[in-house]
Structure formats: structure tokens, C-alpha cells
Regions:
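His/Asp/Glu-rich mid-to-C-terminal helical/loop segments that flank catalytic regions of hydrolases
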Residues: 109-155
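Metal-dependent peptidase/peptidase-like ectodomains
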Residues: 2-107
Length: 155
């Protein structure tokens, strides 16, 4: 979605051509850079995912995500969650344009690596087992959102 040039795809989607009208959009679950390992963690502990923004606009979204983790048993790591974090990950992926439109969002992320935004970031470097567990968490979060009788509340 052209995030390397200012998140243009998500901006276009939210501002001009949403598949689902923005006022009917419940949440955005953004998966970006989830298939690798954070070098700080190494390959010893791959059973994690960084969670960014889940509690900014909705406590309900945050709690649904935590509850959905019973199916994947990941370490939900919130170290980058702060909107004032020096790395500014909260502002650096496609979920941000949804948040700007008052749509709660979660940015799922496994960390920056040496191939970040480089042509060397290729499919054979994906770590599929931890990726599968991360996707399982997102699936169950989405399932709960889609099947809930009530819309999640905004703060």
C-alpha cells in the first residue's frame, strides 16, 4: 500500500474508496512485518507478537485481542505501544489512517530486521511457525469482532 511513500494506499482507501463505508468499519487489524524475528529477541523466543495501538481508541478492542490470545498463547508484547515511543511505530503503518478516522486499530508486528524495506526481504526468510501463531491470534480477534452482538465502544 505504498507505506514507503507515506501510507498512500491506506490513505486512499480511508479517504476516497473504502470497500466498506468508514462509518460501518468496526476496526482495523493491521499485519505488517510479522514473519520475521526481532534481532533483539533472536530465534530463542519466537512465541511473541508486538501489539501497538489496541488500547488507544477502544478498551473493548484491547480486551478482545487479549482474550483471543487463549487460542495462540503468544507473549503479547506492548513495549512499542506508546504513541510517544521514540520509534514512532504507532504512526508508521497502514492502521494509522484508520485511527485518524476514529476507527480502532491494532498493529501486529514482529520487529524491525536488517531487510526492512529492502529487496532482500524475501519469502524464504519468513519464519512460518511463529507467523502461523500470530495469524491465529488475529483470526480469533477478527472472529470475535465479526460475531459480536454489540459494536465495540470507543473511548
Amino acid at each position: 500500500t505504498a507505506e514507503e511513500r507515506g501510507l498512500l494506499g491506506s490513505k486512499y482507501y480511508t479517504d476516497y474508496d473504502p470497500l466498506v463505508p468508514i462509518n460501518n468499519t468496526i476496526a482495523n487489524l493491521n499485519m505488517d512485518m510479522m514473519g520475521r524475528a526481532d534481532p533483539e529477541r533472536g530465534v530463542r523466543n519466537l512465541n511473541y507478537v508486538y501489539i501497538i495501538g489496541s488500547d488507544v481508541l477502544s478498551d473493548d478492542l484491547h480486551e478482545i485481542n487479549i482474550d483471543a490470545n487463549k487460542y495462540s498463547n503468544l507473549e503479547l508484547d506492548f513495549r512499542f505501544n506508546g504513541i510517544d515511543h521514540p520509534d514512532q511505530f504507532y504512526y508508521r503503518s497502514d492502521h494509522f489512517h484508520f485511527i485518524k478516522n476514529n476507527i480502532p486499530a491494532i498493529f501486529y508486528f514482529s520487529g524491525v530486521h536488517e531487510d526492512y524495506h529492502e529487496p532482500t526481504d524475501t519469502a524464504e526468510k519468513i519464519l512460518y511457525e511463529p507467523y502461523k501463531r500470530r495469524v491465529k491470534l488475529i483470526f480469533h480477534t477478527a472472529w470475535e469482532l465479526a460475531n459480536s452482538k454489540e459494536r465495540i465502544k470507543l473511548k
